[in-house]
């Protein structure tokens, strides 16, 4: 009889956003006359920029001609895209990244789950608490997390690093030594950012302890404060201890188009074994490459027109973030985020739990957000709102919330 991967049976309920979706569908069925506004899941609402659409059309036409047709892409991705990434995302910030250290993928979510394939099962992970659920759930699937404690809401073999109002939602170095450290800045869900000085301490710590940092920089384009690094490789020594995940979803609207990349420096080794070589082997074996059409669109993001157009979209979303943040503060809420990230993290009022506030907002304002407890134990009593809606819906949602 064949056997299943029993680690999947340890996963707690359904994926957070699936649960939210079910609740919202039920509410809509029971209240067909209500106009529900979602400030929940972080999906963009603006269309792809004109220069990106133009590149998509051109590449599509190329696929119709024998002379310009493209099949499988190179394992690492097309050089024209990797060169643009190296130049604009790294060289422009004083960081040198070799083209064979850049691995094109179909998104940061895939890579954040897949990167665990190159690490042994008995590695101990450390995560921020609250945290993007994919980091923990994919390690549950891999058998690294131990057993779930229903009382504490924690896994026995996971080091939780609390992110609280007291530490401005940036974790302290853990007392227990981890092997793999997951960091995400600007942070999802709290919207917090990390200064270069604080991130350097994490790099120094990882080198000292022989740990590796998985650094999710999917929201770096939203950074507005100069003392916050856009890449972990701005820190001295980071190439010896860090893998960086990047995405085109939030900076260029590719949530439905799917494109991202991962940086694995050749300096990063374990017992003399190159993680770059391991990831290249894994990448070439399990992934046939992002489509040529999509990679061409990705390269257009770095054109002068693409840079200007995507910056305009980012400014649009960050204006929404300002509307949410200012409106909530005016209504007496305790909030953070919304300055270097498109997420606003609010303390639930009147002692409500995260899910109680979710139901309260849905039932009384027809507004959807994300319960903080879905991101980890330290998220209880908090709630996430996103700035990815339309400006008009954002204004209306805040009007409803302020009138409660």
Curated annotation (Swiss-Prot):
The modification N6-(pyridoxal phosphate)lysine is found at residue 250. Pathway: Amino-acid biosynthesis; L-lysine biosynthesis via DAP pathway; LL-2,6-diaminopimelate from (S)-tetrahydrodipicolinate (aminotransferase route): step 1/1. It comes from the Bacteria. The keyword Transferase applies. Pyridoxal 5'-phosphate binds at residues 72, 108-109, 132, 188, 219, 247-249, 258, 288. It catalyses: (2S,6S)-2,6-diaminopimelate + 2-oxoglutarate = (S)-2,3,4,5-tetrahydrodipicolinate + L-glutamate + H2O + H(+). GO terms for biological process: lysine biosynthetic process via diaminopimelate, diaminopimelate-aminotransferase pathway. Pfam families: Aminotran_1_2. Its EC number is 2.6.1.83. SUPFAM superfamilies: PLP-dependent transferases. InterPro entries: Aminotransferase_I/II_large, DapL/ALD1, NHTrfase_class1_PyrdxlP-BS, PyrdxlP-dep_Trfase, PyrdxlP-dep_Trfase_major, PyrdxlP-dep_Trfase_small. CDD domains: AAT_like. Substrate binds at residues 15, 42, 109, 132, 188, 288, 384. One of its GO terms (molecular function) is pyridoxal phosphate binding. Its cofactor is pyridoxal 5'-phosphate. Homodimer. Belongs to the class-I pyridoxal-phosphate-dependent aminotransferase family. LL-diaminopimelate aminotransferase subfamily. This is LL-diaminopimelate aminotransferase. It comes from Lachnoclostridium phytofermentans (strain ATCC 700394 / DSM 18823 / ISDg) (Clostridium phytofermentans). The gene is dapL.
């Amino acid at each position: 009889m064949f056997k299943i991967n029993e680690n999947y049976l340890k996963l707690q309920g359904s994926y957070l956003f699936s649960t939210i979706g079910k609740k919202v569908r039920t509410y809509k069925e029971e209240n067909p006359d209500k106009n529900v506004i979602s400030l929940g899941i972080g999906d963009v609402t603006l269309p792809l920029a004109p220069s990106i659409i133009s590149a998509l059309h051109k590449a599509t036409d190329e696929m119709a001609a024998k002379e310009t047709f493209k099949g499988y892409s190179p394992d690492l991705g097309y050089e024209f895209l990797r060169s643009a990434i190296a130049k604009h995302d790294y060289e422009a910030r004083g960081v040198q990244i070799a083209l064979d250290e850049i691995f094109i993928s179909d998104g940061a979510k895939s890579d954040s789950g897949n990167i665990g394939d190159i690490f042994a099962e008995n590695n101990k992970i450390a995560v921020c608490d609250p945290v993007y659920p994919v980091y923990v759930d994919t390690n549950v699937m891999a058998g690294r997390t131990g057993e779930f404690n229903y009382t504490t809401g924690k896994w026995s073999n996971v080091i939780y690093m609390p992110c609280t109002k007291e530490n401005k939602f940036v974790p302290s170095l853990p007392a227990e030594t981890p092997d793999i450290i997951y960091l995400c800045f600007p942070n999802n869900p709290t919207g917090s950012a990390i200064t270069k000085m604080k991130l350097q301490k994490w790099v120094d710590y990882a080198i000292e302890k022989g740990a590796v940092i998985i650094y999710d920089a999917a929201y770096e384009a939203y950074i507005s404060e100069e003392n916050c690094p856009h890449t972990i490789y701005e820190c001295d020594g980071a190439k010896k201890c860090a893998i960086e995940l990047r995405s085109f979803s939030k900076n260029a609207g590719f949530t439905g188009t799917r494109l991202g990349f991962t940086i694995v420096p050749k300096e990063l080794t374990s017992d003399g074994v190159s993680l770059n070589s391991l990831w290249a082997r894994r990448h070439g074996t399990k992934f046939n490459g992002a489509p040529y059409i999509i990679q061409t669109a990705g390269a257009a993001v770095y054109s002068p027109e693409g840079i200007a157009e995507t910056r305009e979209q980012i400014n649009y979303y960050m204006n929404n973030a300002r509307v949410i943040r200012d409106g909530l503060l005016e209504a007496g809420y305790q909030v953070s985020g919304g300055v270097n990230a498109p997420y606003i993290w609010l303390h639930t009022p009147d002692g409500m739990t995260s899910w109680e506030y979710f139901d309260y907002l849905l039932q009384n304002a027809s507004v959807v957000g994300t319960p903080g407890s879905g991101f980890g134990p330290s998220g209880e009593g908090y709630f996430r709102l996103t700035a990815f809606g339309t400006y008009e819906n954002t204004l209306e949602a805040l009007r409803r919330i302020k009138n409660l």
